[in-house]
């Protein structure tokens, strides 16, 4: 169900398609225990989940579980299957490893997926059927539709912002909403009171962190 794979870019935790999240978390704990003293606290790994679209809402819980075990997820890789993906993993690792922000100067079309371990900034539109998975925040200088998942590494402090926030789905850490912003009004989505709220830029009120 879970295993580690060493590549030239570092260690990757591969999670095969699954039905029960608790079984996956237990399997991760067991595998790390089995590896004895291989890891040191704070070691960074990459995460790849087979059929990630099916399990996107579980990613924050998996990242949090790994952090509790002393491991930090530096990047999240996309793949439909685990077997035969080594070359794809290497290509994606070279483009994302140790990068704090990813800037995209184009529209993201339907069927395209952008994955990055940090913040994602898009100078263009995110069309219906497109998806962004970001470890940090997502800012779109254009119309944002499709699915945007933020805070997969950063957690609840991440935000999703756009000049026109008309997304099909917004996820920040473990919170999900299908609400949209006011049409043609620059808006920002953030976690407040244990839920995602969407507010105009000029009226946004962030929850104070302790």
UniProtKB/Swiss-Prot annotation:
Entry's Pfam families?
A: MinC_C (PF03775), MinC_N (PF05209)
The keyword Acetylation appears for this protein: no
- Kindly state which keywords UniProt assigns to this record, in alphabetical order: Cell cycle, Cell division, Septation
Q: Could you list the residue ranges that cross the membrane?
A: none
Q: Name one GO biological process term.
A: regulation of cell septum assembly
Protein role? Cell division inhibitor that blocks the formation of polar Z ring septums. Rapidly oscillates between the poles of the cell to destabilize FtsZ filaments that have formed before they mature into polar Z rings. Prevents FtsZ polymerization.
Task: Give the protein family.
Answer: Belongs to the MinC family.
Q: How does it assemble?
A: Interacts with MinD and FtsZ.
Protein's name according to its UniProt entry: Probable septum site-determining protein MinC
The organism encoding this protein is Thermotoga sp. (strain RQ2)
Lineage at the top is: Bacteria, Thermotogati, Thermotogota, Thermotogae, Thermotogales
